[in-house]
């Protein structure tokens, strides 16, 4: 009887059901109790043809909002280098700078799968370094999985981590940590380079990665790779055929300054609203309007 109950609940909980399509209402907590999203749920969604969204996040409060919104996968990306710490690239950020961010996100998102980025310099030297870095994120921060950049060149690291029981999300195409080698922010996998991108995708899948991010890859190539792989693909500037999509949340919500990349769609003007609220608050304080009687004891 208990097995039947468990099986039935698995079919109806948040983690086992596909994400709710845009424009439709999420099931109520009473009708569909939520549980933790696991890597096997992403595999199930790929097999069933259900697409899903991933967002970056770097703090407790934002993680809580996205978890409440039903975002199934949250990435504490090394993009924190840019949007949290103000570095020009992702290269300078360290494990010690990322771990406190991951801790906050894990606490704020009880249902999402939380993935932590391994920063530049923490895994390139080989499997032992990768295992040491990933272990810190799992033990000290409570991450559920880690992400690392590279294809064939990091296959041994991926195999080592998965053998140790650490789920790995791979990242191919444009890899921001290699921006200096790649000559800037350039689309990868065009022309003859397509074969290497395909080889990278196959290599990370065979090494044991549970999914792979493809960044700034031609849509046609991303479609081909998604069809070849049994693991989910996650696109960022890789067209609509990927199994999932990811954006930096500040780009998605309109908090980032400057021109957005071509692959970004802005769904809000959070930056404008924050500025408006801050200006109004300052004016109310200066004019003696705030605090008013209702704000006093």
UniProtKB/Swiss-Prot annotation:
Reaction(s) catalysed by this chain's protein: 3-methyl-2-oxobutanoate + (6R)-5,10-methylene-5,6,7,8-tetrahydrofolate + H2O = 2-dehydropantoate + (6S)-5,6,7,8-tetrahydrofolate
One short Pfam name that applies is Pantoate_transf
Q: Does the keyword Lipoprotein apply?
A: no
Carries keyword Thylakoid? Answer: no
UniProt-annotated location(s) = Cytoplasm
Per the record, the pathway is:
Cofactor biosynthesis; (R)-pantothenate biosynthesis; (R)-pantoate from 3-methyl-2-oxobutanoate: step 1/2
Q: Where is the composition biased (Polar residues)?
A: 1-12
User: Which cofactor is recorded for it?
Assistant: Mg(2+)
Recorded GO cellular component terms are: cytoplasm
Which Enzyme Commission number(s) are on file for it? 2.1.2.11
Q: Where is the active site?
A: 215 (proton acceptor)
- Into which family does the record put it? Belongs to the PanB family.
Q: What is this protein called?
A: 3-methyl-2-oxobutanoate hydroxymethyltransferase
Q: Organism source for this protein? A: Mycobacterium ulcerans (strain Agy99)
């Amino acid at each position: 009887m208990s097995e039947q109950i468990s099986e039935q609940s698995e079919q109806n909980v948040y983690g086992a059901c596909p994400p709710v399509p845009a424009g439709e209402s999420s099931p109520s907590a009473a009708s569909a109790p939520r549980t933790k999203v696991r890597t096997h749920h992403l595999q199930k969604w790929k097999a069933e043809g259900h697409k899903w969204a991933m967002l970056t996040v770097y703090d407790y409060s934002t993680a809580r909002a996205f978890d409440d919104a039903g975002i199934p996968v949250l990435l504490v990306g090394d993009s924190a280098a840019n949007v949290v710490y103000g570095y020009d690239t992702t290269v300078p950020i360290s494990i010690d700078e990322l771990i406190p961010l991951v801790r906050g996100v894990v606490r704020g998102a009880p249902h999402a799968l939380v993935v932590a980025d391994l920063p530049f310099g923490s895994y390139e030297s080989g499997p032992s370094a990768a295992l040491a870095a990933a272990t810190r994120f799992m033990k000290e921060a409570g991450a559920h999985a880690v992400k690392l950049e590279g294809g064939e060149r990091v296959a041994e690291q991926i195999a080592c981590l998965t053998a140790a029981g650490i789920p790995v999300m791979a990242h191919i195409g444009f890899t921001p940590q290699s921006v200096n080698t790649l000559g800037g922010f350039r689309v990868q996998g065009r022309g003859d380079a397509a074969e290497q991108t395909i080889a990278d995708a196959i290599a990370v899948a065979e090494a044991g990665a549970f999914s792979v991010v493809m960044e700034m890859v031609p849509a046609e190539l991303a479609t081909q790779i998604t069809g070849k792989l049994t693991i989910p693909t996650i696109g960022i500037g890789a067209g609509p055929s990927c199994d999932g999509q990811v954006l930096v949340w500040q780009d998605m919500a309109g908090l980032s300054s400057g021109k957005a990349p071509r692959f970004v769609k802005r769904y809000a003007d959070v930056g404008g609203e924050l500025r408006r609220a801050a200006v109004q608050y300052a004016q109310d304080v200066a004019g003696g309007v705030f605090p008013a009687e209702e704000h006093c004891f």
